[in-house]
Design a protein with these regions (language model features):
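Histidine-centered active-site/metal-ligand motif
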Residues: 152
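Short, local alpha-helical segments
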Residues: 158, 176-178
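Conserved beta-strand->loop/alpha-helix structural units within folded catalytic cores of enzymes
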Residues: 178-179, 197-198
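Domain-scale signature associated with acetyltransferase and cell-envelope carbohydrate enzymes
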Residues: 1-147, 168-174, 181, 187, ...
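Flexible, solvent-exposed loop segments that connect beta-strands
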Residues: 155-162
Length: 245
C-alpha cells in the first residue's frame, strides 16, 4: 500500500509538469550541456510571449533550479494565465520559485536577478525595464507586484525637471513580504525586513536597518527588533521547495 502511494505521488508530480514548454525553454535559452539537466521547470499552462533575451545561472546547474508555476501554497488550482516575456537578462543565483498564474516581463537591456531561494507566490507580477534584484531568501506572498517603471514621462511644470521613468529596485536578503504588496521603483530594503500585507514600497528604507516591520501606503516603519525565525525555517524551506520528481 505504501509503495502504491509513492508511485501515485510520483505519477501525479510528473503529470503536473508542462514537459513540452519545459524542454522548449531550456533548449532555447541554455547551452546543450545546461539544458539537458532541465534546470527550468514549467508547471501548468504558460503563454510564452518572447524568449529573445538570456537566462544565466550563477551556480552549478541541476534539475529544477527555477520553478515556474510551482505549487507550494495552500491553494493549488491555477486559472491558466501565466505569462513569460524575457527580452533582457534573467540571472538566477541558485534556486528560485514562482507560484501559479505568474506574469514576468523583462524588457530589452533590463536585468532581473533572483537570489537563492527567492520566490513570488501565486498571481505574482514582475515588470522589469531597468534593474530589479531579489536577495537570498527574499520571499513574497501571493498577488504581489514588482514594477520598476511608471510607463510614462513626468515633468515638473514649474521647473521643467523631467523625472526618470524607470528606477532600480533592490529587495534585501531574508525579506518576508506578505501578500498584495506593491513594490515600485527606487525601493531599497535591508536584509531581514518584514513587510505587512497591502503595503506600498516606493523609496529607500535601508536607513531603518535590519529586523524591522514596514507597513502602510506608502510604507513606514511599524516595528523594530522583529525578525522571521529563519534559523528554524531555512532548512525546511529548502527541502520543501526543492523540485523532486
Amino acid at each position: 500500500m505504501i509503495l502504491i502511494r509513492k508511485i501515485y505521488r510520483k505519477i501525479k508530480s510528473f503529470l503536473k509538469v508542462n514537459w513540452i514548454k519545459t524542454i522548449y525553454i531550456n533548449f532555447k535559452m541554455l547551452s546543450f550541456e545546461q539544458a539537458r539537466r532541465l534546470p527550468i521547470v514549467i508547471f501548468g499552462k504558460c503563454s510564452i510571449q518572447s524568449l529573445s533575451g538570456k537566462i544565466i545561472f550563477r551556480s552549478p546547474v541541476e534539475f529544477g533550479m527555477l520553478g515556474l508555476g510551482q505549487r507550494y501554497e495552500v491553494f493549488s488550482k491555477e486559472s491558466g494565465k501565466a505569462e513569460l516575456n524575457i527580452q533582457g537578462k534573467l540571472i538566477i543565483n541558485s534556486k528560485a520559485q514562482f507560484g501559479y498564474d505568474y506574469k514576468i516581463f523583462i524588457d530589452k537591456n533590463a536585468i532581473l536577478t533572483l537570489g537563492n531561494m527567492s520566490s513570488m507566490a501565486s498571481q505574482a507580477k514582475i515588470i522589469c525595464t531597468q534593474n530589479i534584484t531579489l536577495g537570498d531568501f527574499c520571499r513574497l506572498g501571493s498577488e504581489c507586484q514588482i514594477i520598476d517603471t511608471n510607463f510614462h514621462n513626468l515633468k515638473n511644470v514649474k521647473t521643467h525637471e523631467v523625472f526618470n521613468k524607470s528606477n532600480d529596485i533592490w529587495l534585501g536578503g531574508f525579506n518576508f513580504i506578505s501578500n498584495r504588496v506593491s513594490v515600485l521603483g527606487k525601493t531599497v530594503t535591508s536584509d531581514y525586513c518584514i513587510v505587512a500585507s497591502n503595503t506600498l514600497l516606493n523609496k529607500d528604507y535601508s536607513s531603518f536597518g535590519e529586523n524591522i516591520i514596514l507597513g502602510g501606503i506608502p510604507a513606514k516603519l511599524v516595528k523594530e527588533n522583529i525578525v522571521r525565525d529563519w534559523e528554524t525555517e531555512k532548512e525546511n524551506l529548502e527541502n520543501y521547495l526543492t523540485i523532486k520528481l
